Amino acid sequence: MVRQFLFSCALLSSVALQAQKGDKPSPYWLDPEVNRVNCEAPRSAFFAYENTDLAQKGIKKDSKRFMTLEGDWRFNFVTNHNEAPKGFEATDFDDSKWVDFPVPGLFEINGYGDRIYKNVGYAWNTQFDNNPPFVEEKNNYTGSYRKEILVPADWKGEDIFLHVGSATSNLKVWVNGKFVGYSEDS
């Protein structure tokens, strides 16, 4: 039996969002002390091939234990974070008006938001005041991504890891409508 999963991701262009003073404790994405939830600790990369020959070749895509998620994903872009679609992680969410978007791919070089390159300084200085860790919801570009994948039946009972090579600035992931993780600056 093949298991079907719907991956939903939201990428925010901010590191943290400003919380109102006096509110109850901030959710993790508003807390500068929280960089990840349900993620493996950062470390050198490795991959467990099923045999020595494949390991010596070192080509992950040749392994039956590897699945690429590259390709077209359903994509929605909003300029202001608070306008991101609510409930888009639900398996029955209608994304028919969304566009197909190439992954890997930066939304800034695919026609969304502003192209930014900074190796020093504050990358979003044209969008809002430089006041880290506080960031406005306005002009806080947010991309929402959805993809349906089929997981091979022989993966049942195995640990499955999602490796995101790069996400700016943070990422939340759901599988079949259930939250599974959060990461910053992956």
What positions do the PLM features span?
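Mature N-terminal segment immediately following signal peptide/propeptide cleavage
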Residues: 61-77, 100
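Short, contiguous pre-domain boundary segments
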Residues: 46-58
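Accessory beta-strand-rich segments of carbohydrate-active enzymes
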Residues: 21-40, 55, 59-60, 74-78, ...
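Surface-exposed, low-complexity/disordered Ser/Thr/Gly/Pro/Asn-rich loops and linkers
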Residues: 110-136
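Bacterial Sec-dependent N-terminal signal peptides
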Residues: 1-22
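Disulfide-rich extracellular domains of secreted proteins
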Residues: 69, 90-93, 180
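Short Gly/aromatic-enriched secondary-structure transition segments
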Residues: 84-96, 101
